[in-house]
A protein has these predicted regions:
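Short, solvent-exposed loop/turn segments at secondary-structure junctions
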Residues: 22, 71, 105-106, 129, ...
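Radical SAM enzyme [4Fe-4S]-AdoMet core and its adjacent flexible, acidic
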Residues: 131-151, 155, 159-219
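N-terminal-biased segments
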Residues: 63-70, 128-135, 139
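Helix N-cap and loop-to-helix transition residues
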Residues: 43, 74, 108, 129, ...
Length: 219
C-alpha cells in the first residue's frame, strides 16, 4: 500500500543542542558561535519537546545523532537529551542508539565514561595528516595543536572503551586535499581506523563564502 513506508519511517534524528564550537573549520556549513556565546543553546523545554516528537515516529529503531556546532560545548544538554530519551524508551521499547559528532578536543575522561555507559558512539572528523588537518580544521585558539590533541584524545577514548570501534571518522575534501589521498589513507591506517568516509564540500556556509580559496570543479 502507499502507506506501507510509514512502518519504517525515519529512524535517524539529528539534534543540535548548541551552535557553539571551538573550531574554525574553513568549510563549516553552519553559523557557528564562539564557545562562550550561549545565544544559540537549546533550552530544556525545547529538548524535551524534541525527544517527545522523535518517539512519535512509528519506526522500531531510533537513532539520535548530536550535531552542532560541537555538542561537547554543551555536554549537560547532551546528557539531558540522552536521559530523557532513555526515560521515554522505558515505555516505547524501541531499539535506541546515540551518536555524538565532535572534534574530540573538548572531551574529558569523565565525558567519555558517560558516553560509554549510555552506549553513545562517537563520530569525528579527520582530514588527513597534521598539516592538512590543521589547515582545514584549525582551532579558534591558534596556540593549540588540533591534530595533536585529536590524536591524544582518540587514544584516551579507545582506552576507556576498550576497543577501536567506538569512534569512526570522515574526511571533508577541500582543494588542499586534492593529490593527497594516499597521505590521507595512510593517516587513517596509522591511527587505527578501519574505514574512511569521503565527504565533498557543501556549497553553503563558510564553504560558499571562501569558495575561491577551497573549492574545486565537480569534474
Amino acid at each position: 500500500t502507499k502507506k506501507s513506508i510509514l512502518g519504517d519511517f525515519t529512524s535517524l534524528h539529528m539534534v543540535v543542542p548548541t551552535l557553539r564550537c571551538n573550531s574554525s573549520c574553513i568549510y563549516c556549513q553552519v553559523a557557528r558561535k564562539n564557545r562562550d556565546d550561549h545565544s544559540a543553546d537549546m533550552t530544556k523545554q525545547t529538548a524535551k519537546n524534541i525527544v517527545k516528537t522523535i518517539f512519535q515516529s512509528p519506526s522500531p529503531c531510533i537513532k539520535i545523532e548530536f550535531q552542532g556546532g560541537d555538542p561537547s560545548t554543551d555536554f549537560e544538554m547532551v546528557k539531558y537529551i540522552i536521559e530523557e530519551a532513555e526515560w521515554q524508551n522505558l515505555f516505547k521499547k524501541k531499539a535506541l542508539d546515540f551518536v555524538i559528532c565532535t572534534n574530540l578536543t573538548l572531551l574529558s575522561e569523565k565525558m567519555v565514561q558517560y558516553l560509554k555507559k549510555h552506549n553513545c558512539m562517537i563520530s569525528t572528523s579527520l582530514d588527513g595528516p597534521k598539516d592538512l588537518h590543521d589547515i582545514n580544521r584549525p582551532l579558534q585558539d591558534k596556540k593549540l595543536d588540533h591534530h595533536a590533541i585529536f590524536e591524544s584524545h582518540l587514544s584516551m577514548i579507545r582506552k576507556i572503551w576498550g576497543n577501536n570501534d567506538c569512534a569512526s571518522a570522515l574526511m571533508t575534501t577541500s582543494k588542499y586535499s586534492l593529490g593527497r589521498f594516499k597521505d590521507i589513507i595512510d593517516e587513517y591506517i596509522r591511527l587505527g581506523f578501519k574505514s574512511i568516509f569521503l565527504r565533498s564540500l557543501n556549497p553553503y556556509g563558510f564553504a560558499k563564502q571562501y569558495k575561491e580559496k577551497i573549492a574545486y570543479p565537480i569534474e
